Curated annotation (Swiss-Prot):
<keyword id="KW-0793">Thylakoid</keyword>
<keyword id="KW-0375">Hydrogen ion transport</keyword>
<dbReference type="InterPro" id="IPR002146">
    <property type="entry name" value="ATP_synth_b/b'su_bac/chlpt"/>
</dbReference>
<dbReference type="GO" id="GO:0009535">
    <property type="term" value="C:chloroplast thylakoid membrane"/>
</dbReference>
<dbReference type="GO" id="GO:0046933">
    <property type="term" value="F:proton-transporting ATP synthase activity, rotational mechanism"/>
</dbReference>
<keyword id="KW-0813">Transport</keyword>
<protein>
    <recommendedName>
        <fullName>ATP synthase subunit b, chloroplastic</fullName>
    </recommendedName>
</protein>
<keyword id="KW-0066">ATP synthesis</keyword>
<feature type="transmembrane region" description="Helical">
    <location>
        <begin position="27"/>
        <end position="49"/>
    </location>
</feature>
<keyword id="KW-0472">Membrane</keyword>
<dbReference type="Pfam" id="PF00430">
    <property type="entry name" value="ATP-synt_B"/>
</dbReference>
<dbReference type="GO" id="GO:0045259">
    <property type="term" value="C:proton-transporting ATP synthase complex"/>
</dbReference>
<keyword id="KW-0812">Transmembrane</keyword>
<comment type="function">
    <text>F(1)F(0) ATP synthase produces ATP from ADP in the presence of a proton or sodium gradient. F-type ATPases consist of two structural domains, F(1) containing the extramembraneous catalytic core and F(0) containing the membrane proton channel, linked together by a central stalk and a peripheral stalk. During catalysis, ATP synthesis in the catalytic domain of F(1) is coupled via a rotary mechanism of the central stalk subunits to proton translocation.</text>
</comment>
<keyword id="KW-0150">Chloroplast</keyword>
<keyword id="KW-0406">Ion transport</keyword>
<keyword id="KW-1133">Transmembrane helix</keyword>
Amino acid sequence: MKNLTDSFVYLGHWPSAGSFGFNTDILATNPINLSVVFGVLIFFGKGVLNDLLDNRKQRILNTIRNSEELREGAIQQLENARIRLRKVETEADQFRVNGYSEIEREKLNLINSTYRTLKQLENYKNETILFEQQRTINQVRERVFQQALQGAIGTLNSCLSNELHLRTINANIGMFGTMKEITD
């Protein structure tokens, strides 16, 4: 590396009279040297610059192409997400409507069932009241009959003597005998 640097230093110190060389003093540079340097730079630099620009252009185009592909993919994903969202919203609306109608149906069924149960309870209550009334009426009749029978027995016992009692029995036996003859 040192040899290479030394050779450039020696080139810069060549004598300027009658020879061709590099002038390292920028203020003393002549237009011919500048044009040669610019010509070499343009000749060799043009290809390098074109390659750099082409590479840069290709990278930019690839980046744009990739961005477009990603954009299209993102748009497709967004569209798919919107479709799924609409589908889910539709299903949610159906569940909501079905749920409300199911709730209303259950509510009506519950109301009807409760009404029938209340009606049955009312019928049972009325039947129980009627049964209790009949039982009470029968008990009252039985007591009235027992009291009337006891009163009649008491009255008969106090009014009837043994002789009257025997006559009544004989008359009744006679009536039964007559009835038996008629039925035969």
